[in-house]
């Protein structure tokens, strides 16, 4: 009888220990941009020091989960699979904020004013967004934040959009619409303009814009600014834990481990979110 009691007690202790260890683990999802090229190892190496820093600040082990596909991170957040998540594309992050499933606790310093530039050839006749009617505009991946912002620009300008190929049946419709095509990466956009596949191209990569303008290319228009690379916490986390994570991120530059994490990730730091900007951006993107 005593032996059975001891065995049962031992099993209970093991199970309780396992539960305690599981409760201490924070799942940190990481979703980078789809239009930039980086390997999973490069991304994990970048974020590991940040995960360790958050772990020390919260007293919990942090497990990194790389989620490259936007639809996968959407599905995961719908089920609160991540306690903390870093998301490059603002439209994916802010859809979760609007839905109440997650809260933005910090934005990445230097990435709160992400803008899209529409590139055109210097010898072209385009002078305004309205001149894009009947023309072709190339964007990066359709589910990228860049493409999402382009659609918001056109929608704000009351410009009809289409992805259809021109033919005899839709010729009249095409004349009054902007035909939008896509390529995977931002740095491929200039190729489409230079080779006549599109009359304008959208990019948010400053290096691409600089290279284009340095050789005489022009910028037709620039979008409003949007904060990208957001850090969100699950609304299912206790409020005090949400606050510990927020405070740790905002104060990351005040300690050596924090500075080391910033060096590894390549960012200057994190800043407080702005509810007014957040609400305005959600509305502009049509989320």
Segment roles from a protein language model:
Residues 6-16:
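Bacterial N-terminal signal peptides
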Residues 22-93:
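Extracytoplasmic small-molecule ligand-binding "clamshell" domains
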Residues 67-131, 143-145, 156:
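Acidic, polar ligand-binding/catalytic clefts
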Residues 71-85, 98, 171-174, 179-198, ...:
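Short helices/loops that flank or line small-molecule/ion binding pockets
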Residues 89-99, 151-157, 190-219:
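A ligand-binding cleft/hinge motif common to bilobed small-molecule-binding domains
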């Amino acid at each position: 009888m005593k032996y059975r009691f001891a065995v049962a007690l031992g099993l209970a202790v093991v199970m309780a220990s396992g539960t305690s260890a599981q409760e201490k683990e924070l799942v940190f999802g990481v979703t980078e941009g789809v239009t930039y090229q980086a390997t999973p190892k490069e991304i994990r190496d970048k974020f590991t020091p940040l995960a360790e820093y958050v772990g020390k600040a919260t007293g919990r082990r942090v497990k990194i989960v790389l989620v490259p596909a936007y639809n996968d991170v959407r599905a995961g957040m719908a089920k609160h699979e991540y306690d903390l998540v870093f998301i490059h594309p603002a439209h994916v992050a802010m859809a979760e904020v609007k839905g109440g499933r997650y809260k933005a606790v910090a934005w990445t310093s230097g990435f709160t004013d992400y803008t899209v530039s529409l590139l055109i050839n210097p010898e072209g006749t385009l002078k305004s967004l309205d001149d894009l009617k009947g023309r072709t505009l190339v964007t990066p991946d359709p589910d990228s934040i860049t493409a999402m912002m382009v659609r918001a620009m056109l929608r704000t300008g009351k410009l009809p959009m289409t992805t259809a190929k021109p033919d005899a049946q839709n010729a009249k419709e095409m004349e009054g619409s902007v035909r939008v095509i896509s390529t995977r990466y931002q740095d491929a956009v200039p190729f489409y303009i230079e080779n006549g596949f599109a009359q304008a191209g959208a990019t948010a990569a400053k290096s691409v814009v600089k290279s284009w303008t340095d050789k005489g290319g022009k910028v037709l228009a620039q979008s409003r600014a949007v904060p990208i690379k957001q850090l969100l916490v699950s609304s299912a986390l206790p409020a005090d834990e949400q606050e510990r994570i927020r405070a740790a991120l905002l104060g990351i530059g005040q300690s050596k481990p924090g500075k080391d994490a910033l060096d590894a990730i390549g960012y200057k730091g994190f800043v407080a979110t702005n509810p007014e900007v957040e609400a305005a951006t959600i509305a502009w993107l049509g989320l």
